[in-house]
């Protein structure tokens, strides 16, 4: 099993030194879903939410969050993102919205945390904008779908994970 990299030999937390790592193209894709009442889903789908364009604002929130990840996750490196793409898939039958965030950089560390942070903040933004009509919304199934680049190479989620 791979050792945890954010702890030194004495068990103290530290930020990993990536200074000697090669700068490579890195990509990460993460996803997550929010499920809501059918009436709430219709408000979002039709653009009739009282607070405005829910998905448009959630998209901007996700992009902003990816850029602030190092401010939120204590041992995460601040990195220069070269691309952030945010997509939403609406599932009317399930009254759910799936957010997918793709992050890219050319750097010495991966962008998985940025993609995951973007997804979470997008879902939280949807919740915030719709909570007046539906406090029972459920966010879940947040996960990394794939990552590419870097020393550890490529990784793609399996259906079970």
Curated annotation (Swiss-Prot):
Q: Which residues form the active site?
A: 128
**Single GO biological process annotation from the record:** Mo-molybdopterin cofactor biosynthetic process
List UniProt keywords, sorted A-Z: Lyase, Molybdenum cofactor biosynthesis
GO molecular function terms here? cyclic pyranopterin monophosphate synthase activity
| Residues binding substrate | 75-77, 113-114
Reaction equations catalysed: (8S)-3',8-cyclo-7,8-dihydroguanosine 5'-triphosphate = cyclic pyranopterin phosphate + diphosphate
Presence of the UniProt keyword Kinase in the record: no
Q: Which InterPro entries match?
A: MoaC, MoaC_bact/euk, MoaC_sf, MoCo_biosynth_MoaA/MoaC, Mopterin_CF_biosynth-C_dom
Q: What is its EC number?
A: 4.6.1.17
Role summary: Catalyzes the conversion of (8S)-3',8-cyclo-7,8-dihydroguanosine 5'-triphosphate to cyclic pyranopterin monophosphate (cPMP).
Q: What is this protein called?
A: Cyclic pyranopterin monophosphate synthase
Give the encoding gene's name: moaC
